[in-house]
Design a protein with these regions (language model features):
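Signature of the catalytic double-stranded beta-helix
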Residues: 1-46, 51-63
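Residue-level detector of short, conserved catalytic/binding motifs and their immediate flanks
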Residues: 66, 123, 145
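Catalytic core of non-heme Fe(II) oxygenases with the double-stranded beta-helix
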Residues: 47-119
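Conserved metal-binding segment of the jelly-roll/cupin
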Residues: 117-132
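Residues in well-ordered beta-strands of folded domains
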Residues: 36-40, 54, 69-71, 82-84, ...
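Non-heme Fe(II)/2-oxoglutarate
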Residues: 136-178
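A structural signal for the main folded, soluble domain(s) of proteins
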Residues: 94, 122, 126, 154-161
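Short beta-strand segments enriched in hydrophobic/aromatic residues
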Residues: 72, 131, 151-153
Length: 178
């Protein structure tokens, strides 16, 4: 796995430091050990591949984490990730719990408030785990490639994603087994 090499980890640390350090007020943080690569093909809903709106907390990511989402190709219109403003995310989340909304209802409400994360290669979005985000059907003829990773602020709630397993210390790299 390329993510497990020291060379890749150093490049990832440089990238994360550049994107996140100032925005996290200089706080120390850990870095997700393995990044995710996302591929959004044209008309992906036809193939059952649309990523429903969700928040990281629903998948075990604690509120002490931040996601960094970065397109590798142009990301715009319907081929990009969609995100909801913070207050809309909080309101919909509260209603989801209070009224026991199903995924269909969550999707309908999120569509009313979502905005496209238009970005070019070299640009990134940094957001909290409580932000609702997801995809809509890619109606463009362009496949969007992106990657995402997460940082855990020192002392932050990590949910089910444990330091030392899901995260590694910034600037520390695994040594290959001999």
């Amino acid at each position: 796995r390329i993510c497990k090499t020291e060379e890749f980890a150093k490049k990832l640390d440089e990238f994360v430091d550049h994107i996140a350090r100032d925005r996290l007020d200089g706080a120390d943080f850990m870095v997700q050990d393995v990044v995710g690569v996302r591929v959004v093909i044209p008309n992906q809903s036809k193939h059952g591949r649309t990523l429903n709106f969700h928040q990281g907390i629903w998948f075990g990511h604690g509120p002490g984490m931040f996601s960094i989402w970065s397109p590798i190709t142009e990301a715009y219109d319907s081929n990009t990730m969609q995100i909801l403003p913070w207050q809309a995310s909080r309101d919909i989340t509260q209603n989801t719990y209070n009224e026991q909304w199903d995924y269909q209802k969550i999707q309908q409400e999120c569509l009313k408030h979502s905005i496209p994360c238009n970005a070019s290669p070299g640009q990134s979005w940094l957001f909290q785990q409580g932000h609702l985000h997801g995809n809509i059907n890619n109606d463009t003829d362009i496949t969007r490639w992106s990657f995402d990773t997460r940082v855990l602020v020192k002392g932050g709630n990590y949910g089910r994603r444990r330091p030392g397993g899901y995260f590694r210390l910034f600037g520390e790299y695994r040594q290959p087994l001999s």
